[in-house]
Structures are given as structure tokens and as C-alpha cells.
Amino acid sequence: MDKIIIEGGQTRLEGEVVIEGAKNAVLPLLAASILPSKGKTILRNVPILSDVFTMNNVVRGLDIRVDFNEAANEITVDASGHILDEAPYEYVSQMRASIVVLGPILARNGHAKVSMPGGCTIGSRPINLHLKGLEAMGATITQKGGDITAQADRLQGAMIYMDFPSVGATQNLMMAATLADGVTTIENAAREPEIVDLAQFLNKMGARIRGAGTETLTITGVTHLRGVEHDVVQDRIEAGTFMVAAAMTSGNVLIRDAVWEHNRPLISKLMEMGVSVTEEEYGIRVQANTPKLKPVTVKTLPHPGFPTDMQAQFTALMAVVNGESTMVETVFENRFQHLEEMRRMGLQSEILRETAMIHGGRQLQGAPVMSTDLRASAALILTGIVAQGVTIVNNLVHLDRGYYQFHEKLAKLGATISRSSEV
């Protein structure tokens, strides 16, 4: 099993780092590439991540041709002709995001069968919003033996209110509605930048979607879609992770290609702490004098609130800021598992239901730790950079799902970090 080894203590990160295309954008884009019955789809700026390979295999399992040119960061999908209606269990079971193929397969074929998805073990993450929305559009849904089967000769436009602005459900229903009869309205829709990117992609294909980035989406169904070319939006979570890394280490880092608007909630909290964050021609520069930073209170919320996918990394920053900071996690339950590992490094914290109190500013010590999910992996690595001594981060399977060459990028900024496959 691979591990990352960090010699921490006095590292100050400096330089530039290039941000990849967004994992959370490319996965639904690949699912949407199932929809066109004519032409090829070409996705550019695709990150080389294990989740991308998994989704490629999910789509290939539908008898769709998928070619990944890793050297060019480009994927070509040809879904013209007949496609299968059952997603392969072998790959669906590996990744939660694979549930977003349900809507496109159903809309394209009138029948779809998808196994219950896998992925990070963060809370229950129910998929009931996906299923309720499809039922509102006329689908008959059955669940048996861990499989979800959906049937609808032709989906019908519907008015859908989502009890929670779920990103995955919004994506699934938006894609399904593009080929439905009539108009579908999704109220309390997710507003994340990845939703906007998906809507722009679908509209290029010939879909008629209005309101992306707002609480109300309106989709007028069409009879067919065609393949197009599209550049994947930059990864705001990777950008945010490097912003936090700079802030934790009294660093001075230019995050190239980072989009200010996509990172506004995080930037606001960094500035509240006393971090200097400025927009430059080629990206966002973050500079900090860590000992002078102030503690803050943060509450995770759906976009445009503070992103839950930055919670673990930001608690790592709180750990090195003098005073008591508070993190309230309102999106997912059971997402403080990384704090248990950070306690092995000397962190003092208390957790009461959805709230974590971080007593920051004490010198942390290197230790062997185990990553429990994708963002926890990044948080533990950042903590290892500032901790005194050697930190070994184990179980990197999660890290590889969402960060490309993470340790190499940190090393170029000055961290003493390496990756080893030795037992």
C-alpha cells in the first residue's frame, strides 16, 4: 500500500502551482456524454484521476466507445448507435458519483439499471432525491437486491421541488429532463459552478436549460442531442486546498488558473483570518504570516456557502492558528474523522454532533496517520507539513481519487515530501 512521507516543521511554501480540471465537473460531463445519439463528444482539460478512469469504465460498460488521451488530458466519447441500459456493477460500486448515469441512460433508452453506488464513507448520502425526481417525471422505480431499476417509455416534464439542493440529484434530473416531453422545473436546485458547467455543456449539445447557477432550473425537453467539444472548468477544491496550504505555512503561492468567483466563500474566510488573497492576471496569490492569523467560525453550506469539501483542509489551518476556532458541518454527518487522526499529532479538539472546536496554535508532532476519505487525505498531508518531525500518511486510495500528483506539486513549492510503495 502506498504512503506519503513528510518531514515537517519549518517549511514555507513558495512558488506557483497549476490547477487541474475539476473532478466534480468531469464526472457528470462523462455521464452527460451518454445522451447524444449523434456525433462524438470531446472533453478537454480532463484530470488524470482514478475516479475518471472508473467513470470511463462505467460508460464503456454501456457499449459506448471511450478513448482517454492522457498526454493531452482529453477524452473522446462516441455514444452514437445502440447503447446498453445496465451500468456495470464492478465499477458503479467503486464510486458514489456513478449514480448520475441513471438519468441519462433512462432518458436515452427508456430503461435503466444501476447498482447502489460506492465511494467515500461520509455519512449516509441518500439518493432518494434522485429517485423522487425521476418518479415525478413519470419513471417507475424499483429497488431490489442492491439494484435500482427505472422504466419510462418517455419521461414527462414536471415541477420538482428538492428538499435539499443536492448536487448529484440536480445533475441527474437536469440531464434526464433534456430529453423529456415538455418543460421540467427544478426548485431549490444546487447552484455550484459544476452545475453551471454541466448546463453549458448540455446547451452546446442542443439542450434548452435556463437558470443554471440559481435556485430554479427550467429545462425544455428536446428530441435528440449531438456530441460537442468542451473544456472542463478548473477544480475549485484543489485550488482551495493550495490556498490553505499557503496560509498554513506563512507561504507565498500563486494558484494558477484558479477562479475567484468559484472560491469566494473560502477567500472571505481566509481574509477574515488575516490572510492576504489577491487576484492576479494568471490566478490567485495567497500570502500569510501564520503566527498572526486570527481564529474564526465557519459553517459549511451548499453553494454559495462555504464548501463541505474544504472543511477538512480548513480545520487543518485552524489547528495552526492561535486561539479557538469553530467548524460547523451542516452538509454531511460523520465528516470529522480526520480530527481523530490529527489528535495523534497533538491536536486538541472537541466534537459535539455537527460542531468541532479546534484549540489551535500548539506545536503539532509528526505521526503515522490513516486517511479516511478524499479531503481528509489532503488535510492530513498539509498537517504533516507543519508538524515537527516525520508524518506518514497511509491509505492513499482516497487521495488518488481527487488530486493529481499532489505530493509532487507540494514538493515543487518547497515541502519535504515523497511517496513510497514500500511495505
Swiss-Prot record:
Show the InterPro entries listed in the entry: Enolpyruvate_Tfrase_dom, Enolpyruvate_Tfrase_sf, MurA_subfamily, RNA3'P_cycl/enolpyr_Trfase_a/b, UDP_GlcNAc_COvinyl_MurA
Post-translational modification 2-(S-cysteinyl)pyruvic acid O-phosphothioketal, affected residues:
C120
Task: State a GO cellular component annotated for this protein.
Answer: cytoplasm
Its main subcellular localisation, reduced to a broad class, is cytoplasm
- Entry-linked CDD domains: UdpNAET (cd01555)
**Keyword set for this entry?**
Cell cycle, Cell division, Cell shape, Cell wall biogenesis/degradation, Cytoplasm, Peptidoglycan synthesis, Pyruvate, Transferase
Top-level lineage group: Bacteria
| Catalytic activity reported | phosphoenolpyruvate + UDP-N-acetyl-alpha-D-glucosamine = UDP-N-acetyl-3-O-(1-carboxyvinyl)-alpha-D-glucosamine + phosphate
Instruction: Supply the enzyme class, top level.
Output: transferase
| Residues the record lists as binding phosphoenolpyruvate | K23, N24
> Family per UniProt?
Belongs to the EPSP synthase family. MurA subfamily.
What protein name is recorded for this chain?
UDP-N-acetylglucosamine 1-carboxyvinyltransferase 1
Give the organism the record lists: Streptococcus pyogenes serotype M1
**Lineage, uppermost ranks:** Bacteria, Bacillati, Bacillota, Bacilli, Lactobacillales
